[in-house]
């Protein structure tokens, strides 16, 4: 029987290439996604066996439906990979509590609840890998709600790593910068941008090599280090 992994956020290009990387290790996939047709197309384009994929077309906001599916799983899971997220618009979220709440649900509350609910079904020696963001390393006005949600997620993963250590479950924190997905529309130096395929390969390798925290792009690690050295009384005057 093949080991099974769950990928949440299966419609993304990162997930497409994660399918390719983990498929080589003979896994079966349980995929949660917003667009089932897109996931099916990913599988076809990569020429993968569709019988190794179970696809659930669910909204990020509908966590209760996710729980029902988890309750029906009658086998252990080897790994969980959380790729989903949404940046949002802080100017709109400051004026609309519902939008702000949705940002926190999508980027913090839902991944925490989903992972926590799955832990009893996770095999000892398994893994949890979560894509966070450099936006979670220091608060910025242009990423106000998204960044604070990702900061909470990074802290949760640190605590979870301690909590699951005795079970031999490996917790992997992924910290990307800019990734050239379909929605990417930021003008930036090419050195700051990573392709979805390279991102997926780095995630795969970090799980294989049990790297607990990885930056997808080394330049972002340097930038984050420098930003964290700036005193708050100076940092507050910046606009980025």
Where do the protein language model's features map onto the residues?
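Catalytic Tyr-X3-Lys loop
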Residues: 86, 96-113, 153
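N-terminal Rossmann NAD(P)H-binding glycine-rich loop of SDR-like oxidoreductase domains
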Residues: 11-12, 19
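Active-site-adjacent segment of SDR/Rossmann-fold oxidoreductases
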Residues: 138, 159-170
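Rossmann-fold scaffold of SDR-type NAD(P)-dependent oxidoreductases
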Residues: 8, 77-85, 130, 172
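Active-site helix of classical SDR
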Residues: 115, 149
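Conserved mid-core segment of classical short-chain dehydrogenase/reductases
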Residues: 63, 71, 85-101, 142
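C-terminal helical subdomain
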Residues: 173, 188-225
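Residue(s) in the substrate-gating loop at a strand-loop-helix junction
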Residues: 133
